[in-house]
């Protein structure tokens, strides 16, 4: 993912910075414990598309 794009993307719920998990192709919001998918190199930052993360996945 382009670093410039990653620098401007934020969580739609809390506006926190998102962190890339390149292995899982997801953008992670640690504050809300959500993972937003990246499909075909396009980040899908819709809350309905996000999956909840466990505390272990955040660490």
UniProtKB/Swiss-Prot annotation:
Species classification: Bacteria, Pseudomonadati, Pseudomonadota, Betaproteobacteria, Burkholderiales
Gene3D superfamilies: 2.20.25.10
Family: Belongs to the UPF0434 family.
Name listed for the protein in its UniProt record: UPF0434 protein Pnec_0311
InterPro entries cross-referenced by the UniProt entry: Trm112-like
One cellular component (GO) term of this entry: cytosol
């Amino acid at each position: 993912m382009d670093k410039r794009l990653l620098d401007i993307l934020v969580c739609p719920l809390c506006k926190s910075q998102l962190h890339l998990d390149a292995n899982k192709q997801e953008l992670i919001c640690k504050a809300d414990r959500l993972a937003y998918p990246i499909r075909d190199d396009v980040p899908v930052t819709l809350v309905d598309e996000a999956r909840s993360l466990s505390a272990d996945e955040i660490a």
